[in-house]
Amino acid sequence: MSEEVHPRADELDALGALDLARLMHDEDTHAVEAIAPHLPDIARAVEAVADRLRSGGRLHYFGAGTSGLIAAMDAAECPATFGVAEGTVQAHTALEPGQEDDRILGQDAARSASLRPGDAAVGVTASGRTAFVLGALEEATARGTFTVNVTYTGPATDVTGFVEVYETSPRDGSIDDIVRVAVTIGR
């Protein structure tokens, strides 16, 4: 679960500013170190998305709650940062209470986006199990859209953080390639 209390956070309110800054820095450093071994696979996903954008495809983010807000911020920055046309990168979010648990709402969001085989759909979900995001990625896969699910879950759960790349064939919708990259972040 993404909503667990971090063991080093028991007394955050009692820490001085310097100790708090050190704690946050240490945790950020652990996250960066955990990602490093998986950079080739992450780069593969980035290249696949970039190829689609260069070929006239679009990038659609799907996220709920804070993950959705982060996806929306990234989508808003893409035109200025990467020079893509406005509207090429879009975020579809579930921000109202309970929407994150609605798989059908995610499927509907993907349908409303008019996803097609030349597009990319990126799900962003802390738990890896957010129904809205999974529903959107299911619909995207059914439409032959390239999908990536970026997620984080703590090491205490059965599911570790991972990036999943599902390459689908526009001809028959079958999954040609699956890459699972285990990334345990934090503690």
Question: Could you describe each region identified by the protein language model?
Answer:
Residues L12-G16, D41, G98-L105:
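Short secondary-structure boundary/capping elements
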Residues P37-R54:
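A short, well-structured juxtamembrane/interface segment
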